[in-house]
């Protein structure tokens, strides 16, 4: 009886892991999130990425609508894709 329960548990875990890897939700945090977004949104991989606009400075004007859209969305993508799992479609919605 114990063997049957263990086998069923192993099979269940395997199915869950496989489903998640086949296009289900994943968590993207830190550098992995940034690299994934660069590839999805701009087709840039780490090897060919150039530092663009590195000398641009955005001062805190108290008017967030004047900042680039990706600055405003930063917290949302972290909430949706780092603190909890998200799909590729959710990531693409932030491009």
UniProtKB/Swiss-Prot annotation:
Keyword tags: Cleavage on pair of basic residues, Disulfide bond, Hormone, Secreted, Signal
A GO cellular component annotation in the UniProt record: extracellular space
Q: Can you say where in the cell this protein is located? A: Secreted
Q: Which InterPro entries match?
A: Bombyxin, Insulin-like, Insulin-like_sf, Insulin_CS, Insulin_family
Q: Residues of the signal sequence?
A: 1-19
Propeptide residues? 53-71
Note the coiled coil stretches, chain numbering: none
Gene3D superfamilies, per this entry?
Insulin-like
The family annotation for this protein states: Belongs to the insulin family.
Can you state the subunit structure given in the record?
Heterodimer of a B chain and an A chain linked by two disulfide bonds.
UniProt-recorded name of the protein? Bombyxin F-1
């Amino acid at each position: 009886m114990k063997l049957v329960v263990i086998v069923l548990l192993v099979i269940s875990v395997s199915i869950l892991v496989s489903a998640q890897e086949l296009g289900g939700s994943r968590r993207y945090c830190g550098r992995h999130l940034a690299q994934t977004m660069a590839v999805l949104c701009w087709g840039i991989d780490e090897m060919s990425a150039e530092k663009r606009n590195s000398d641009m400075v955005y001062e805190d004007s108290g008017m967030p609508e004047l900042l680039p859209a990706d600055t405003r969305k930063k917290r949302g993508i972290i909430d949706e894709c780092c603190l909890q799992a998200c799909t590729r479609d959710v990531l693409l919605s932030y491009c």
